[in-house]
Structure formats: structure tokens, C-alpha cells
Amino acid sequence: MKKDIHPAYVETQVTCTCGATFTTRSTATSGTIHADVCSQCHPFYTGKQKILDTGGRVARFEARYAKKAAADAKK
């Protein structure tokens, strides 16, 4: 095997947006990683359901097809 071709594998502190931190090993040169979700705040692991911002999409869908239904009713 060739020597000195692999990146340094160092201890890395992972910080989640919920505030949880844990240490792992990574090739990240800064030694820190910022994660959006972790096992302490992800709904799959916590069993809690988070409400996603789908209300806007549903409202747009209903408005679009309400217009189509109204146009079909006029015909």
C-alpha cells in the first residue's frame, strides 16, 4: 500500500441544531460538524411527530383544482 495518501482521521465533535453533541471520528479538518438532525431529535427515534410545512402546498393544490372544477361546472 502507498503511504501518506489517506486523509487524517481525527476525533470530531458533532453538534446538532437541537443542542445535542457527541464525539465521533471523521476526516473533517476543522474537527467539528454541524448536523440538522440527530438521534435525539429525529422523529423516527423519538417517536414524536413533527408538523411539516405542508399547509402551503395543500392549499395551493386545493386552490388549483377548485379553479378547474369551477371551470368544468361552467361548461
Swiss-Prot record:
Binding of Zn(2+), residues: C16, C18, C38, C41
InterPro entries for this protein: Ribosomal_bL28/bL31-like_sf, Ribosomal_bL31, Ribosomal_bL31_A, Ribosomal_bL31_sf
Keywords: Metal-binding, Ribonucleoprotein, Ribosomal protein, RNA-binding, rRNA-binding, Zinc
Comment on bound cofactor: Binds 1 zinc ion per subunit.
Any one GO CC term of the record: ribonucleoprotein complex
GO MF terms held by the record: metal ion binding; rRNA binding; structural constituent of ribosome
Ribonucleoprotein among keywords: yes
NCBIfam families: L31, PRK00019.1, PRK00528.1
Similarity field: Belongs to the bacterial ribosomal protein bL31 family. Type A subfamily.
Protein's job: Binds the 23S rRNA.
Protein name in UniProt: Large ribosomal subunit protein bL31
Organism in which the protein naturally occurs: Nocardioides sp. (strain ATCC BAA-499 / JS614)
